[in-house]
């Protein structure tokens, strides 16, 4: 924030506190504005008041947002930790609060003035009910020749709101004249940019009180940290004669942890610094660069570790193979590849890396193919098992159908058998009856024949055997006929 604007804001706050507060409030705000930040103990010591008297003053100014507080726990040396309260002013908040208060006061007076600007003719002195002249005519009491209030039956009096409105208008004009400096300051502030005055910024502007203060005046001090005291460090030579070179600023810087770093560079220094940064970045990029065989797949594309049946000429591999073939380490015959250039160590290392990587990818491809084959075999086995289960289910269903058909046929056969048995039984019964009748007739015929042949048998005893044979033959014939 610029110096003129800073003075305007401070003068505005002083004018407001003197015009609307007065008394001890002026001392509190002036002390905080002068020192930028004040601890509670230091403020009580400067004003020579106790905490009971200071509490209401701080509460009123805080409620009106003219001052702000900051609490933090500090660790003094060789003592217990304490919680200290610091008071400072947040300029944007205070300016907004002043704008709002001025607007409320002016608006309240204008609303009251507009409400009573038109007199209504008559009013009740008791309930303050107002009536127009036409309404008052209806409330006329002929016995008393007075206008009576419809609510409390009291005589109405003439409304003198015109005089009161004039007084209120004069009061509003006097108020506007009194707050005109505030309005002018607010207009100037609105045309400028006000920075946020945080606790850290307020510490940077600190003017320490001239007493034996126990407050650290630091932001978030840690346990065991060294507290800065005035005179601990010498002033910088290049700051003499400036706003930061005065005694108060040096003491404020000594009592706060805020530091200022100044770095003066030229265009050539910036170019050199930029080139150095670019070189360092390029070196880091080279170190972190991904190898070529990681960017693209080399399976089937390079000579070493390729999966196809083609062979590529490699002098190193061929030479080692020839050495293994010649046990006596005899020099091998010269071939066409001996005329080629000798490979450098870097190229050989790259080829070895490519070969290793290709072998790895080849093994990985074989492993993947093996896994795919195993998966296909497992899928085929599962399909075969499913087909076998389906066939077993079909066989079971067919067996059940055949069993059902056999049971049905057996039931039908039993029915037919029962019917046939019944018919056979009946036929056997009829045959038995017929056979019995035939036997009866045969016995009767035999008896009759025996009766007829009885006398002759007695008369001719010698011929008995022949006659008996003839009779038996005849009976057999007759029996057969029957």
Curated annotation (Swiss-Prot):
Biased composition (Polar residues): 321-345, 419-432
PROSITE patterns assigned: HTH_TFE_IIE (PS51344)
One GO term of the biological process aspect: transcription initiation at RNA polymerase II promoter
Molecular function terms, GO-annotated: RNA polymerase II complex binding; zinc ion binding
Zinc finger (C4-type): 124-152
Major subcellular location class: nucleus
Keyword Metal-binding: yes
Cellular component, GO annotation: mitochondrion; nucleus; transcription factor TFIIE complex; transcription preinitiation complex
Stated name of the protein: Transcription initiation factor IIE subunit alpha
Note: Present with 35900 molecules/cell in log phase SD medium.
Basic and acidic residues bias spans: 274-286, 433-444
């Amino acid at each position: 924030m610029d110096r003129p604007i800073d003075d305007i804001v401070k003068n505005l706050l002083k004018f407001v506190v003197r015009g609307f507060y007065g008394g001890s409030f002026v001392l509190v705000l002036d002390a905080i504005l002068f020192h930028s930040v004040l601890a509670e103990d230091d403020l009580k010591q400067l004003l020579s008041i106790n905490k009971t008297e200071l509490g209401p003053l701080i509460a009123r100014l805080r409620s009106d947002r003219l001052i702000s507080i900051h609490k933090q726990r500090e660790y003094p040396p060789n003592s217990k930790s304490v919680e200290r309260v610091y008071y400072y002013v947040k300029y944007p908040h205070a300016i907004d609060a002043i704008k709002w208060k001025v607007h409320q006061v002016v608006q309240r007076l204008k609303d009251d003035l507009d409400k009573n600007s038109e007199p209504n003719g008559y009013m009740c002195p008791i309930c303050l009910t107002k009536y127009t002249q036409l309404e008052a005519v209806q409330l006329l009491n002929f016995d008393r020749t007075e206008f009576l209030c419809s609510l409390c039956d009291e005589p109405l009096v003439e409304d003198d709101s015109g005089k009161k409105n004039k007084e209120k208008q004069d009061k509003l004009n006097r108020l506007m004249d009194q707050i005109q400096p505030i309005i002018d300051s607010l207009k100037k502030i609105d045309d400028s940019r006000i920075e946020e005055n945080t606790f850290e910024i307020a510490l940077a502007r600190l003017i320490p009180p001239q007493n034996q203060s126990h407050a650290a005046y630091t932001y978030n001090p840690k346990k065991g940290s060294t507290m800065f005291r005035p005179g601990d460090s010498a002033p910088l030579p290049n700051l003499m004669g400036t706003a930061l070179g005065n005694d108060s600023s040096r003491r404020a810087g000594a009592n706060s942890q805020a530091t200022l770093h100044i770095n003066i560079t030229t265009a050539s220094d910036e170019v050199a610094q930029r080139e150095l940064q670019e070189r360092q970045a390029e070196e880091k990029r080279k170190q972190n660069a991904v190898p070529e065989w990681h960017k693209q797949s080399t399976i089937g594309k390079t000579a070493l570790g390729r999966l196809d049946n083609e062979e590529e000429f490699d002098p190193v591999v061929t030479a080692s193979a020839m050495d293994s073939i010649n046990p006596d380490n005899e020099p091998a015959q010269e071939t066409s590849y001996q005329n080629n250039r000798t490979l450098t160590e870097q190229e050989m290392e790259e080829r070895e890396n490519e070969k290793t990587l290709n072998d790895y990818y080849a093994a990985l491809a074989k492993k993947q193919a093996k896994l795919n084959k195993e998966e296909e075999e497992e899928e085929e086995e599962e399909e075969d098992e499913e087909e076998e289960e389906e066939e077993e289910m079909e066989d079971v269903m067919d067996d059940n159908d055949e069993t059902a058909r056999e049971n049905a046929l057996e039931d039908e056969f039993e029915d037919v058998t029962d019917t046939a048995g019944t018919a056979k039984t009946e036929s056997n019964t009829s045959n038995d009856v017929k056979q019995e009748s035939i036997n009866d007739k045969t016995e009767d015929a035999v008896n009759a024949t025996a009766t007829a042949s009885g006398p002759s048998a007695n008369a001719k005893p010698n011929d008995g055997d022949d006659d008996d044979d003839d009779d038996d033959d005849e009976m057999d014939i007759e029996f057969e006929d029957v």
